[in-house]
Design a protein with these regions (language model features):
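Residues within mature, well-folded domains
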Residues: 20-151
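Bacterial Sec-dependent N-terminal signal peptides
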Residues: 1-24
């Protein structure tokens, strides 16, 4: 009887594995939210397509409309002409440890008014690129000039 149960379990586990091979999300960057897979690139591209709804508004408005996923890290990008200001920030949706891997998807926000590098560095040094509630509050008041999604 025990042998029969073991053989049955083995057969069931093989059939479960073969069903996973037909995953429609294979090869795409995914985030699992409450046991539900979402296609991160497709989801974020919708914000880029509808950027007219967000340009000229504070970042908090965009973040409040992101109901399925939120940024986990922020990377401030200096302008090569003036390293005293941040003109763009990258928001990534994976952990800090995974954010430098190839093919990560990020949301690039160009700011209407440049952010002093000293302020961006303060948060970077304090939170080590992690997008905290404190940064959400700080950057949330900054006005969006443009939105671009990259992979």
């Amino acid at each position: 009887m025990h042998k029969f149960i073991l053989i049955l379990l083995l057969i069931l586990s093989v059939s479960v594995k073969s069903q996973n091979a037909d995953d429609p999300f294979e090869g795409k960057t995914l985030c699992i939210i409450r046991n539900k897979k979402i296609d991160t690139l497709t989801y974020l591209k919708q914000f880029e397509i509808n950027k007219a709804n967000y340009i000229g508004k504070p970042l908090a408005y965009l973040l409040n409309n992101m109901t399925q996923i939120q940024p986990k890290t922020i990377w401030s990008l200096p302008n090569f002409k003036s390293r005293r200001f941040v003109y763009s920030s990258q928001f990534r949706f994976v952990s800090k440890e995974n954010s430098l891997r190839q093919n990560n998807i990020f949301l690039l926000i160009d700011w209407q008014d440049p952010i002093p590098m000293s302020e961006a560095k303060y948060y970077k040094n304090k939170n080590h690129f992690i997008f905290t509630d404190e940064e959400r509050s700080y950057y949330g008041t900054k006005i969006i000039k443009d939105i671009i999604v990259h992979r």
